[in-house]
Amino acid sequence: MRLIFLGPPGAGKGTQAKLLTERYGIPQLSTGDMLRTAVAQATEVGKRAKAVMDAGQLVSDEIVNEIVSDRIDSADCARGFILDGYPRTVPQAVALDRMLEEKGLKLDAVIELKVDEAALVRRMENRVTETVAAGGTVRSDDNPEAFRRRLQEYREKTAPLSEHYARTGRLKTVDGMADVHTVTAEIEKILA
């Protein structure tokens, strides 16, 4: 089973990916984790990524695509995987399609968690309040202004992926505003 989750920050993609990872025994592939691992292991592509990051630049699609390709080739991905944070743009999605085709693989589903943005901001504010009340540390980008910037960036760069996958007939949508278990049940219906 090979899946992609789409949706804005705070929609519950990570929560759902974790639940499905546990249920189906397939890895959740996070772009950030893959990048850090490649750099730590000093792979050829990891060295190139490190040089770019050390120069304070953004890692190119070419490097990210190569890291994803290498990770998909890992033994633990033989039964499938859930992509988290990739693809972020239509060019990355096109590269992923090409990459999977070359490997004789295909995506089983692209699942978009549809959510109300105003409710997402309230969710984030509640999470901050609960974290502070519990004596925890709040992320620096967990404030309404930063969160709205992340939502805007999502709308501009990542939301067009929905149209891309809808055109190819692979996009399935789920109401991400429901409770966690209801969302999981809806996703499992899609995967059945």
Curated annotation (Swiss-Prot):
Query: Could you name the domain of life of the organism this protein comes from?
Result: Bacteria
Q: Which UniProt keywords apply?
A: ATP-binding, Cytoplasm, Kinase, Nucleotide biosynthesis, Nucleotide-binding, Transferase
Cite a single GO BP annotation: AMP salvage
Q: Where in the cell is it found?
A: Cytoplasm
The segments labelled NMP in the record are 30-59
Q: Is the keyword Transferase in the record? A: yes
Q: Please give the record's comment on domains.
A: Consists of three domains, a large central CORE domain and two small peripheral domains, NMPbind and LID, which undergo movements during catalysis. The LID domain closes over the site of phosphoryl transfer upon ATP binding. Assembling and dissambling the active center during each catalytic cycle provides an effective means to prevent ATP hydrolysis.
Query: What family does the database annotate?
Result: Belongs to the adenylate kinase family.
Described by its record, this protein's role is as follows:
Catalyzes the reversible transfer of the terminal phosphate group between ATP and AMP. Plays an important role in cellular energy homeostasis and in adenine nucleotide metabolism.
Give the protein name, as stated in the record: Adenylate kinase
Gene of this entry: adk
